[in-house]
Amino acid sequence: MQMQRHPFLLEKAGERPIHGVWHIPSTEAKGTVLFLHGYKGYMDWGAWPMVGDAFAHAGWRFLRINFTHNGTTPSAPKSFNDLEGFAANTYSRELEESTAVLQALRAEGALSDATATDKPLAVIGHSRGGGVAC
């Protein structure tokens, strides 16, 4: 099964944008998975891109995002060099950002398709991202 990757961007007035990557299956999606990275982590760390591909190959839309204060920047998404941003990060901020992403997906209709509005949604995460997902 073929799949595609597409960028995701959620801009909020006066705040840092939330960047992410969609993994899209070539067939009608079974549902959507939102993936949240862990503490001092980022969406491209380790196997997360391959995990997204695996979900898409299995027929799921998969979105992995970077929290805005995770220590990386859009211009250097794999480098932990934003110490000021990381120092301002909180569990509550990550919870608010994941909620904003879910609200944006609902508003855009990304959690459904042309044939159904009852597709399942899963929010999963690694380490602290798993706690935020709960």
PLM region spans:
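Alpha/beta-hydrolase active-site loop
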Residues: E84-D113
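Alpha/beta-hydrolase fold nucleophile elbow
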Residues: A110-S127
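Short glycine-enriched nucleophile-adjacent loop
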Residues: G130-C134
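Cap/lid segment of the alpha/beta-hydrolase catalytic domain
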Residues: T68-N89
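A generic structural signal for alpha->beta connector loops
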Residues: P17, A47, G59, D118-P120
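N-terminal cap/lid segment of alpha/beta-hydrolase-fold proteins
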Residues: M1-E28
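Short, surface-exposed "cap/lid" segments of acyl-processing enzymes
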Residues: T27-G71
